[in-house]
Amino acid sequence: MSKKILIVDDEPDLLEMVQISLETEGYECIVAYDGFRALDRARKEKPDLIILDVMLPGLNGHKICRLLKFDEQYKHIPIIMLTAEAQEKDRLLGEETGADYYMTKPFAADKLIAKVAELLGK
């Protein structure tokens, strides 16, 4: 059974590129374009991993990460923060909220795929 990944980004082109890259590698992808839908999909779908933008309509990525990581039912789900927020303070905030990895845009798809595989133990 393929691993399920929730991709959350409000940029449709970027979200589609990430989705195609991961599906090509055999992952099942579900998507959300805003913070509230992301939290809802994470709770209902229980993905194996989440790729999460920081700047989102509704709830931002840091709030979503914090809510999931401090909930016993979801804290085991690895979260990759994928964002244009590239300053050191942003990366530290990502770590503080519980993100497992912080990757800045623009990024190389092969690097993202390698990190996904690493976090999923593949």
Residue ranges and their predicted role:
Residues 15, 57, 66, 75, ...:
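The feature encodes the CheY-like receiver
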Residues 16-24:
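Charged docking surfaces used in two-component/phosphorelay signaling
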Residues 26-33, 41:
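Short hydrophobic/Thr-rich beta-strand motif most characteristic of the beta2 strand and flanking loop
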Residues 107-117:
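C-terminal output helix
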Residues 45-51, 56:
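Active-site beta3 strand of CheY-like receiver
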